[in-house]
Amino acid sequence: MASFAQWISGARPRTLPNAVAPVVAGTGTAAWLHSAVWWKALLALVVAVALVIGVNYANDYSDGIRGTDDHRAGPMRLVGSRLAFPRSVLTAAVVGLTVSTVAGLALALLSAPWLIMVGATCIAGAWLYTGSSKPYGYKGFGEVAVFVFFGLVAVLGTEYTQALRVDWVGLVLAVSTGALSSSVLVANNLRDIHTDTQSHKFTLAVRLGDAHTRQLYQALLVATGVLTVVLMVATSWCAVGLVATPLALRAMRPVRSGRMGPDLTPVLRDTGLAMVVWAIAVAGALTLAGSVTY
């Protein structure tokens, strides 16, 4: 059976930047509006991290029982590798999604109860990604969902729970974060394009083809750089976000050079690192430019 280390690996900790970056970005925007509330930021982080972990275990379970993980080029999968019983992985997914739900309910009730409906949509989206009879992740809509849930909803939701409003800076940050989060999934699906095709998993990469998927990945990173310049209208300090440029360029290199399969795995790590560095830098700039409410 799976060891503790394998269970941790099954949670796919390298995807956690998708949870951390939007909360950092949203809190930075709240600070810009003189309304940062750090305990709410921590609660939002619990929501996001638990959601990502729950999604990862849910994907492991759903893909594993379908057999689509049997020949994956990426990280070890618990069900696909026969290291854990499907029911055990499903239980782990339910625990993660439950923790996210409870923390989200608390955050919504203490901020704006109507956000409960938004949270319910996020939980449903997390499960239906691969868990339904017709998973939308198999239809090419995964990147769109990531853009919405880990970009628009996560950033603007974090901002709203603290400031009780959103502004154009938050919207630009949300679009930027969504683009970066989506680029991680684009890179993941580019790596798995051949095995996904064989498994009849029609991800966006499979639908676009290899060349266009590589172009999309690069376009998403470039778009974030352009939007960082736009943020300099709010405060020139946001230029510090460009410190992530070398990391983004390093992530692009294997994509531009035509690497395939497992050789693209480092792209996911480097893209996630670039996303976190960018979010911390821009949020820090906005925090310093505004006054923080403790």
UniProtKB/Swiss-Prot annotation:
Which pathway?
A: Quinol/quinone metabolism; menaquinone biosynthesis; menaquinol from 1,4-dihydroxy-2-naphthoate: step 1/2
From the UniProt record, give one GO term of the biological process aspect. Answer: menaquinone biosynthetic process
What is the membrane topology listed in the Swiss-Prot or TrEMBL record? Multi-pass membrane protein
EC number, UniProt record: 2.5.1.74
Top-level taxonomic group: Bacteria
Pfam families cross-referenced by the UniProt entry? UbiA
Residue stretches spanning the membrane:
35-55, 103-123, 140-160, 166-186, 220-240, 272-292
What CDD domains would the database entry show?
PT_UbiA_UBIAD1
Reaction(s) catalysed by this chain's protein: an all-trans-polyprenyl diphosphate + 1,4-dihydroxy-2-naphthoate + H(+) = a 2-demethylmenaquinol + CO2 + diphosphate
UniProt GO cellular component terms? plasma membrane
Task: Give the subcellular location.
Answer: Cell membrane
Q: Which InterPro entries match?
A: MenA (IPR004657), UbiA_prenyltransferase (IPR000537), UBIAD1 (IPR026046)
Function as written in the Swiss-Prot or TrEMBL entry? Conversion of 1,4-dihydroxy-2-naphthoate (DHNA) to demethylmenaquinone (DMK).
Matching PANTHER family = 1,4-DIHYDROXY-2-NAPHTHOATE OCTAPRENYLTRANSFERASE, UBIA PRENYLTRANSFERASE DOMAIN-CONTAINING PROTEIN 1
Q: Which family does it belong to?
A: Belongs to the MenA family. Type 1 subfamily.
Q: What is this protein called?
A: 1,4-dihydroxy-2-naphthoate octaprenyltransferase
